[in-house]
Amino acid sequence: MAGSVDEEALHQLYLWVDNIPLSRPKRNLSRDFSDGVLVAEVIKFYFPKMVEMHNYVPANSLQQKLSNWSHLNRKVLNKLNFSVPEDVMRKIAQCAPGVVELVLIPLRQRLEERQRRRKQGIGSLQELAPQDGTDYMDVGLSQKARGEGVPDPQGRGQLREGRLPVPRPPGDSQALQSDPSFILQIAEKEQELLASQETVQVLQMKVRRLEHLLQLKNVRIEDLSRRLQQAERKQR
């Protein structure tokens, strides 16, 4: 499948991945990214509050890999107006060579685009609106069952529209964006969400600290047990 992506695009992708600090070494993209965990880490690197890493379990089993990808698709990629079809998720989970690259390349574009819009100071209402007129971007390897594909103009795989945009009355979004009370409500909701996320992060840190203490205690118990066994053998 990697044949549908030009060498320069792959080279740029590998350089990009190498510059992102991840929890485990990157030796083989098809295998390393197959469980979705590193993809979640990549997104978290750009938008830390968008991803909760405890939801993604490093896995070798196909079932757990698909579970990770399904959760990532539903809870995170959807916020980026991006989606990975089930058949593609399965191929990635099975470590099919060259498939994950066809997802990572457009995902990188979407992440950098959103980051650029944030730096330019575009408001949250505009951020939530897809720029291409669709509800989300769909990335695939085949054109069957979902209609004809739309080739990426840069030759980096295939991008396909997953569904038609929801029709909206003309001027409706502009009226909402200019309504001070609506903007205030959005700002308040965003503050509440941030406060909730911070609380969750504090609790997660406490849980990790307790898990670390428990691990240290287990190591200490094993060490004492080993010494006790050695002492008993010497007495015999």
Swiss-Prot record:
It holds the Pfam family CH_2. Gene3D superfamilies: Calponin-like domain (1.10.418.10). InterPro entries: CH_2, CH_dom, CH_dom_sf, Spermatogenesis_Ciliary_MAP. It is found in: Cytoplasm; Cell projection, Cilium, Flagellum; Cytoplasm, Cytoskeleton, Cilium axoneme; Apical cell membrane. The keyword Cell membrane applies. Residues 7-112 form the Calponin-homology (CH) domain. Residues 118-177 are annotated as: Disordered. One of its GO terms (molecular function) is microtubule binding. GO terms for biological process: axonemal central apparatus assembly; cell migration; cilium movement; filopodium assembly; lamellipodium assembly; microtubule bundle formation; negative regulation of microtubule depolymerization; regulation of cytoskeleton organization. Keywords: Actin-binding, Cell membrane, Cell projection, Cilium, Cilium biogenesis/degradation, Cytoplasm, Cytoskeleton, Flagellum, Membrane, Microtubule. Residues 183-236 are annotated as: Essential for homodimerization and microtubule bundling activity. GO terms for cellular component: 9+2 motile cilium; apical plasma membrane; axonemal central apparatus; axoneme; basolateral plasma membrane; ciliary tip; cytoplasm; filopodium. Its main location: cytoplasm. It comes from the Eukaryota. Homodimer. Interacts with actin, TJP1, CGN and CDH1. Microtubule-associated protein involved in the stabilization of microtubules along the axis of migration during radial intercalation. Promotes the establishment and stabilization of an axis of microtubules required for the active migration of cells into the outer epithelium. Microtubule-associated protein that promotes microtubule bundling and stabilizes microtubules against depolymerization in response to cold shock. Radial intercalation is a developmentally reiterated form of migration by which cells move in a direction orthogonal to the plane of the tissue from an inner layer to an outer layer. The Calponin-homology domain mediates its binding to microtubules. PANTHER family: SPERM FLAGELLAR PROTEIN 1 (PTHR12509:SF16), SPERMATOGENESIS-ASSOCIATED 4-RELATED (PTHR12509). This is Sperm flagellar protein 1. It comes from Bos taurus. The gene is SPEF1.
